[in-house]
Amino acid sequence: MPVSTVFLEGPYKVDFKKPWPSEAQQRAAGAEARTRLNRRALGVWEPADEERDPVDVVMAVAASRQAGLIPLRTARMAVSPFTFYRGAAQLMATDLGSQPHTGIYAQMCGDAHLSNFGIYASPERTPVFDINDFDETSQGPWCWDLKRLTTSFVLAARDNGQAGRSEEAVRTAAGAYVAALNEMAGLGWLERHHRMVRADAPVARGVVWTGKMTAIVNQVVSKAVKRTQAWTVGKYTEVVDGAPRLRIDPPVITAVSRRTAAAVTASLRPYLESLSAERRAYLRGYHVVDVAHKVVGVGSVGTYDYIVLLMGDGRRDQLLLQVKEAELSAVKTALGERPRLAYGERVVVGSWLMQGISDPFLGWTQLHGRSFYVRQLKDMKGSHDPARLKGSALVGYAYRCGYTLGLAHSRAGDPHFILGYVGKGAALAGAMWRFSQAYADQTERDYGRFIEAIHEGRIKAAELAPAAPETTAAAPAKAAKAKPKAKAKTAKTKAKAARLKAKAAKGKAAKLQASGGAKP
């Protein structure tokens, strides 16, 4: 039975007569978890099934999505091993679900790779840095989030020609995670929940950024603070026949039928019921003037996602909301657990629990018989381009993300359980480095098979993906057992080949990713 550091997913039950376990009890429970899985074993990666087909797992996620957009999703994932990794949250969750874990549960992001951290505005219009994607959020093993994060740094480093700095980045992220847990352990419940990280300041005392990191942060923050609602409205709207309308830009932004627009508008009524009374009051003066469909992200391509233009008191008072489909969490699927909340509500509750401050208009609804969540579209949002994370900037960003993840796990629950398991953190850092290397190699092999599947016509991409690796992605199981050294060498060769071929086609494919891709 897992030890949960947080309240179970709703409905929440609070017993004011029953005290929460003491710090000593929590740490003892965490230390006891080492008997189930020692800290060195946390760094082991071995696929439970040598014959597993990563392509099947990745494409199974798309079965319930809009078929016409799946080739675009495939093309975006095919840019590089890192973009493949971004779109393969279900694959990694499935892999981790086949491995032993500590038994200590936390509220997870569920997809905590480095590109799912970023900048957004607090209600006071202060730019804050935090996790910004909770599509896969769920209760689950805390270490899954950390493994997802550290592996993403290895893949991004390799993609940027910074493989030599990847170990430092991974160990730094793991160390920062433990530092955040220790800091939050000294605070009360409310203090933890309200602990925020300003986007333009180092995340912790005693941390000194290099000039390169400072320059990158300042540039990203400077861009983000200009992306207000007014800026967003200007980007996504135009005046047609004297009236404001959403700017159609296929295939990323497309028009919808009147019937769909009416359904989306109707879905905002139950959405209002998910908001607090004062939030509902804020929206009472707005009415819907236009609706469009938007293609988002990498792994999310193919889900239903709408942008809604609302008008308030004149043309200067416009608001853009995003109505985004939520699916079953990859974490829940991997653990074989039934969901306790509607998918959209799960995303919202996970955001509330893990973020220092959340979008004031965050809520949930139902549409097309599917679950959705609603939020503002791009209110002072910004993110760091992985391609710019080189040298000390890569390591500095690793610290920022690891620290932020530690804060998020602590806000949602009690850090003493996890600290009881990890101890001072040196063993954890070593384990994360060993795991991240091994799983990055696995991802590159899986990426190679994904590219092969595209070129063989097994799956369709919106535009030609990088050339298939010259060798097959996986050696037969018998040969692998007979010659383990040969297998390791072959795996490295294949991984290197996949990286080189991906880089050769990266320029063209990167344009596809940035623009939204060719029309399916």
Which residues fall in each region the model found?
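Conserved ATP-binding subdomain of kinase catalytic cores across diverse folds
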Residues: 18-109, 114-225, 270-467, 471
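Polar low-complexity intrinsically disordered regions enriched in Ser/Thr and small residues
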Residues: 33, 237, 245, 409, ...
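Long, low-complexity segments enriched in small/aliphatic residues
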Residues: 197-267
